[in-house]
């Protein structure tokens, strides 16, 4: 797809950012540099996504899953047969399985996935002062912006 066609596509990112704001930092930077509407699934449990050409779901990883607010939002609001992309921040490792199970039911096509480290002090990580300090950093943010621009 040509760059001009990509720019015309109407995109939204539905996100949840709970502990340290890692995911919010990423999606707000994307929204500043790309034409993307942001929907905070923690504050807004309903939205009409039918007019969007592509929908992103962004979350920190909690116990190897996307946040419950994202999973419930996708289950309830994602129309069938939509193009989607996924973004996650994590202390341990990326894991898309929880959201992909819902996307499969909705016959969504995943056009891309992006993940980066995010500062994490949950559970045992708190004892050592957290992991992935300083992330997402400027390079992580730039990579996320480029990821969305190239969709």
Residue ranges and their predicted role:
Residues 11-12, 18, 24, 32-37, ...:
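FMN-binding flavodoxin-like domain, especially the glycine-rich phosphate-binding loop
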Residues 1-8:
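Short, Lys/Arg-enriched N-terminal segments with co-localized hydrophobic residues
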Residues 35-46:
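A short beta-strand-loop structural module common to alpha/beta enzyme folds
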């Amino acid at each position: 797809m040509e760059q001009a066609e990509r720019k015309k596509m109407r995109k939204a990112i539905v996100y949840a950012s709970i502990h340290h704001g890692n995911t919010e930092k990423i999606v707000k930077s994307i929204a500043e540099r790309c034409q993307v509407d942001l929907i905070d699934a923690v504050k807004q449990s309903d939205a009409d996504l039918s007019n969007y050409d592509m929908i992103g779901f962004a979350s920190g990883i909690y116990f190897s899953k996307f946040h419950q607010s994202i999973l419930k939002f996708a289950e309830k609001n994602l129309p069938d047969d939509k193009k989607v992309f996924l973004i996650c921040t994590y202390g341990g490792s990326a894991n898309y399985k929880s959201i992909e199970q819902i996307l499969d039911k909705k016959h969504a096509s995943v056009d891309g996935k992006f993940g980066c480290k995010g500062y994490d002090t949950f559970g045992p990580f708190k004892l050592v002062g957290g992991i992935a300090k300083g992330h997402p950093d400027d390079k992580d943010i730039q990579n996320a912006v480029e990821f969305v621009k190239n969709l």
